[in-house]
Amino acid sequence: FHNLVFDWFKGLKKDTKDYWIIERHKNSHKDESVIKQNGNLLTSFNSEYAYLFSLLHNFQASPTDTYEFLYHLPNVARRFVETFLNFKYLERNKIDESIDKLITNPVECERARKFMHYYSHNLTTDKFMKFADLAECQAVVDIIINSVNTLDPIHLTSLKTTVTAT
């Protein structure tokens, strides 16, 4: 429904349209709803997949070393790769079962897999605030995007077009 509404208004001038969202809040004694102006995130991307790619693509073009970004990058990479593989092969496999279909070089495949697992799954408190260094993040993002390009260059071009159009 969300994307359908945005498609209806795509052709209108910016100054003749606005988007609003209803946020529900639970309080201790009652539930309330607040109407708020829709943020850019919901109007800039037509899917979470496009948003995740934009994060990887923008990082590849201009790496940032802020901990706020690096902390989430392995999870962003994992979710993007899982979605790509599920879409490409119409299988709902775990990333371990299908990542080698995307990243065919065994060393690079293992490097990306470990990066996505180790830094995005905090199963114990000893891994709670560990960050991958910037060089490792850059290398793995390059591996992922280059692998998508090798496997499906038309799809990657479409993703880049979607990201640069926002």
Q: What are these regions, as identified by a protein language model?
A:
Residues 129-132:
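Non-catalytic alpha-helical scaffolds
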Residues 1-89, 94-118, 135-166:
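C-terminal lobe/lid and adjacent interdomain/linker elements of RecA-like ASCE P-loop ATPase modules
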